[in-house]
């Protein structure tokens, strides 16, 4: 007998109701999963110019054998010779700085080959093309006991052994990717763009539009001010002096949802650089990481915190893992300058990346990415991509790159309760450098860029070639004083403008007053 129309309606409605309930439960479960993420505070520390193999490669031998590290069989040929130079474990204090420009990295990655498939066979060749003969230096890594803070963190928490810099190039483009998933077409330092400020949207803008707080704790200068938007008045109270505020905020449980820590970039007696940029002592970078960890470990926020430690780029040091070159999306349609017109379709060299949280299992090694596409990789754009997920931001992705990048929220998803056995303190660190900082040394390229940023904040960029020339003439000590003064002046003027009721989207336009302000 055929069912009546009423019974058919009842059956259909019943199926509809069941399906609706299932979909609703699934939706609620997914939403509640996002809402219940244990991480409420993400702390990011980006250090300078070290490759994975150089800093962490030897931990495969004595800390965790599952790490994709080195064995000592990794070698590079010496050009015009039958000799090779193989990777060793006797890295020490490095001076001068190995090559890491866009052109230098091309040579390191491709060697003398046709330039299509990375061989990682050109590090020695490139080092020999520069003054100082660093051909053996770039083929050396640190023993775990030489970087004891990292050895302990790798043992206790998570290391990512397939995390790459965002482009095969120097500091600034890669640092720009960390919080904006693009360098806006830059493959090197662009003076005009620096003066204007890079225009792209950042993860800070996304957080702000979603009413989620962030803070930048700086030691010399907040280099996040390379982004033009970050110079707006509305963000001026997000800038904090690290030495005055970080430990206090951590102790009070008042660290912002996204906490960015910037290291010291200038090497002074009694106040050494701790950014790990050669020729700075890596021991001081270890001390900074130890200080940050211990402040977080004793904070009321510890059980909801994820600390991300990474490096902007490899600094010219050898790494054996071939750089990805398939399926890498251009972030925003921009290309690099002539003559190469780089399409931003390749990643840079692998860099050390460590993550710390009581929600991470001991001895975790994260290697292959798990989407969102088959070609996705961990790279600096993974940071804004993951922040978007963790904080359930309604904003769009910043670029095609962070939409593609692998995210790392899974690293804190395997425990049902936070660990209680995480160490309260990390090992003490012995200095590697036997001498004092060279305060009268000339500036590195990166330090010169920081001085030019300070010149913009100071209003001195209106004086034609002044920023470029002053950087060439300054010593490290003079640059530190200039940068410190410029930063303080800009922040003070911006806060005054806010008190006077200026438009929050405005940027204080400083004017130089060289007659009243000394420039050594």
From Swiss-Prot:
One of the GO BP terms on file: gametophyte development
Entry EC no(s): 3.1.-.-
Regulation: induction: Not induced by inorganic phosphate deprivation.
InterPro entries: Alkaline_phosphatase_core_sf, Phosphoesterase
Segment forming the signal sequence: 1-31
Source species, domain of life: Eukaryota
UniProt cross-references to Gene3D superfamilies, sorted A to Z: Alkaline Phosphatase, subunit A (3.40.720.10)
Pfam families in the cross-refs: Phosphoesterase
Chief subcellular location: secreted
Coiled-coil ranges from the UniProt annotation: none
Protein location: Secreted
This protein's GO CC annotations: chloroplast; extracellular region
Recorded family membership: Belongs to the bacterial phospholipase C family.
Protein name, entry field: Non-specific phospholipase C6
Native organism: Arabidopsis thaliana (Mouse-ear cress)
């Amino acid at each position: 007998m055929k069912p009546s129309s009423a019974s058919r309606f009842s059956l259909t409605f019943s199926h509809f109701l069941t399906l609706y309930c299932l979909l609703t439960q699934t939706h609620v479960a997914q939403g509640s999963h996002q809402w219940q993420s244990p991480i409420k505070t993400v702390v990011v520390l980006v250090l300078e110019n070290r490759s994975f193999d150089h800093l962490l490669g030897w931990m495969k031998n004595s800390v965790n054998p599952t790490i994709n590290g080195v064995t000592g069989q990794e070698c590079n040929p010496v050009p015009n010779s039958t000799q090779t130079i193989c990777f060793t474990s006797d890295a020490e204090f490095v001076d001068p700085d190995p090559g890491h420009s866009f052109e230098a990295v091309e040579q390191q990655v491709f060697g003398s080959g046709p330039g299509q498939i990375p061989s990682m066979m050109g590090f020695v060749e490139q080092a020999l093309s520069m003054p100082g003969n660093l051909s053996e230096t770039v083929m050396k890594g640190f023993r775990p006991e030489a970087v004891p803070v990292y050895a302990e963190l790798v043992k206790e928490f998570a290391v990512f052994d397939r995390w790459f810099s965002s482009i095969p190039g120097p500091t600034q483009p890669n640092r720009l990717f960390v919080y904006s998933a693009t360098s806006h077409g830059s493959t090197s330092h662009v003076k005009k763009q620096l003066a204007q400020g890079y225009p792209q949207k950042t993860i800070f803008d996304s957080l702000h539009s979603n009413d989620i707080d962030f803070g930048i704790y700086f030691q010399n200068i907040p280099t996040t001010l390379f982004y033009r938007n970050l110079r707006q008045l509305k963000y001026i109270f997000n800038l904090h002096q690290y030495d005055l505020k970080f430990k206090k905020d951590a102790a009070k449980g008042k660290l912002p949802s996204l906490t960015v820590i910037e290291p010291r970039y200038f090497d002074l007696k009694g106040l050494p650089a701790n950014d790990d940029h050669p020729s700075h002592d890596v021991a001081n970078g270890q001390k900074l990481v130890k200080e940050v960890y211990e402040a977080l470990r004793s904070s009321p926020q510890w059980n909801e915190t994820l600390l991300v430690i990474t490096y902007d780029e490899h600094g010219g040091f050898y790494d054996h893992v071939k750089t990805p070159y398939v399926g890498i999306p251009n972030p925003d349609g921009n290309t690099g300058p002539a003559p190469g017109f780089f399409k931003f379709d390749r990643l840079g060299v692998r860099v050390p990346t460590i993550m710390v949280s009581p929600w991470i299992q001991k001895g975790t090694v994260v290697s292959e990415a798990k989407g969102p596409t088959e070609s996705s990789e961990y790279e600096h754009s993974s940071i804004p991509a993951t922040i978007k997920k963790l904080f359930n931001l309604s904003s769009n992705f910043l670029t095609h790159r962070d939409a593609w990048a692998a995210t790392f929220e899974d690293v804190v998803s395997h425990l049902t309760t936070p660990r209680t056995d995480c160490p309260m303190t990390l090992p003490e660190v012995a200095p590697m450098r036997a001498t004092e900082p060279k305060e009268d040394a000339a500036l590195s390229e990166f330090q010169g860029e920081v001085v030019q940023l300070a010149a913009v904040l100071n209003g001195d960029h209106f004086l034609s070639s002044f920023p470029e020339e002053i950087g060439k003439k300054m010593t490290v000590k003079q640059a530190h004083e200039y940068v410190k003064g410029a930063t303080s002046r800009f922040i003070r003027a911006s806060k005054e403008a806010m008190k006077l009721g200026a438009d929050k989207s405005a940027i204080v336009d400083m004017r130089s007053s060289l007659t009243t302000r000394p420039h050594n």
